[in-house]
Amino acid sequence: MKRFISHLAINIALVSFAIGQSPTAQRPANSTSEQEVRQMIEEYRTAILQRDIATLEKIWADDYVFVNAAGDVLAKTERLANIKSGATTLDSINEEENVTVRVYQNSAVTTSRVTLKGQYSGQPISGEYRSILVWVKGSEGWQLVSNQLTALKPK
């Protein structure tokens, strides 16, 4: 529990730091870092769809935290176990809006709206979601430290 709280605090601090930066602190649009993050998003999407455990282990930082649409919080080991067991499978991930990437030195925050079909933690999932991903660039390159899905109400 202490580990979870410290990871959550770090993720909140990262997002708060990123949001609090002035626009001049951001890199220019289509910067090398932004392009790298966009490439990582596509690698992540492909790895999730293909249940590519080796790639996901590299993409997710050791202290990675996922908050699903039901509000459940899962660590890297729990997500990997769910994918290995088949409890988490995605049949499709479709971007409904352009992905927004904001880069702040060695961190990036991405937001998008996606349509998902499959299951998370053994529960069916289908519909539109708002997605936020927090990336950090370290010695291993860009890694995902946290992401969250929020279900959107049908219009």
Question: What do the predicted segments below correspond to?
Answer:
Residues 1-4:
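Positively charged n-region of N-terminal signal peptides that target proteins for export
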Residues 7-18:
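Bacterial N-terminal signal peptides
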Residues 19-62, 143, 155:
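Short, low-complexity N-terminal intrinsically disordered segments enriched in polar/charged residues
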Residues 60, 70, 105, 114-116, ...:
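A mature extracytoplasmic/lumenal domain signature
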Residues 48, 63-74, 85-89:
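A short gly/proline-enriched turn/hairpin at secondary-structure junctions
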Residues 82-125:
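Surface-exposed, charged secondary-structure patches
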Residues 44, 56, 64, 79, ...:
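Hydrophobic pocket/interface hotspot
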Residues 128-153:
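Short beta-strand edge/turn micro-motifs at domain boundaries
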